[in-house]
Amino acid sequence: SCAVFDETGGLVANAPHIPVHLGSMSDSVREIIRQRGASLRDGDVYMLNAPHAGGTHLPDITVIAPVIFDGETAPAFFTAARGHHADVGGVTPGSMPPDSRRIEDEGVLLQDVLLVREGRLLEPEVRALFEAGPHPARDVDRNIADLKAQIAAVVRGAAELKRLVAHYGRTGVQAYMRHVQDNAEEQIRRVIARLKPGQFETPMDIGAFIKVAVKPDPAERRVTIDFTGTSAQADNNFNAPLAITRAATLYVFRTLVDDNIPLNEGCLKPLKLKIPERSMI
C-alpha cells in the first residue's frame, strides 16, 4: 500500500488496495513527526510496525519518507509504503501465531527506526534489529530485500512530488491537495444527512461483543460512532489497536459515497469516534 500525505500527516491520496492499511497509515506518519520533529531530513527514511503507532500486525512494516525542499527544514509532504513481510520473527513462522498473548510472540517490534540516513541504507543496524529479541526474524535477507523495494517506492514518490511542484508550483499543488480532502469531506457530509440512527452488536467466537451506535446529526452534518459497551481488552490476539478501528470506520463511510473520490483525511473530519478505554478495539 502506497500513499501521499500532507505536512501534518493527513492522508491525501493512495493506491486503494488494502483499506485497513490506508486508513491507519496517517497515525504512523504522525508518530514519526512526533518522535523526530525538527530532526527530520530530506533523504532520510524511517520504518515502524508498532500497533500503538498506527501499525496493524507486526508483519506489516511501514516505510516513511519526509519530502523537504532545498533551503527548508520542515517537510512539505510525506510518502509512505506499507508492506506485509513473510516473517518478522515470533513463536511461529509467518509471525501470525494463533495463540499469541504478548506482542513479542508475533515478532520484532519496530518503532521510529531510522532506515536510511541521507540516502544511505543503514543495513548493519537494521539487520541487528531483526536478529534481536527472544524470537528474531527467520530470513533477514528477505526482509532487507523487501525494505529496499519499499524504500524505492517512497523515494520515487518523493521525487515525483518534487517534480510536480517544480512544474505547477508549491501553492497550486498544496491547494489541490486541500481541495481533494475538502471534496471528500463534503461527500461524507452529504451521506450523513441521509443516515438514520441505529445500534448494532456483533458476537465474537471468544464470547466477546463489539457494540456500536451510529448517531447522525443531520443539522450539523456530523455523526458520532459510539462503541460504548464493547468488551474489554482480551487476554489473547483478538484485540485491535485504535488506528485499525479508525481505518475500518473510515472505509465503511467511504463505501457509502457513490462518486469516485480517493480515500483520504477529509473522509474522517465529519466523524466522531467514541471508543472505550481498555476495550478490545
Regions found by a protein language model. Name each.
Residues 10-12, 25-68, 201-205:
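Conserved mixed alpha/beta core segments that line enzyme active sites in large multi-domain catalysts
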Residues 5, 188, 210-214, 223, ...:
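Extended, hydrophobic alpha-helical segments in both membrane/secreted and soluble proteins
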Residues 62-70, 80, 216:
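A short, hydrophobic, proline-anchored segment that marks a local hinge/packing element in signaling
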Residues 20-23, 54, 236-237, 241, ...:
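Hydrophobic core positions in small helical hairpin nucleic-acid-binding modules
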Residues 1-4, 45, 49-52, 170-171, ...:
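A glycine-rich phosphate-binding loop feature that marks nucleotide/adenosyl-phosphate handling sites
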Residues 155-233:
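Accessory "access/gating" subregions that flank catalytic or transport cores
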Residues 70, 74-161:
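Mobile "lid/hinge" segments at catalytic clefts and subdomain interfaces of large enzymes
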Residues 18-32, 65, 79-117, 228-252:
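Extended active-site and interfacial segments that coordinate phosphate-rich ligands
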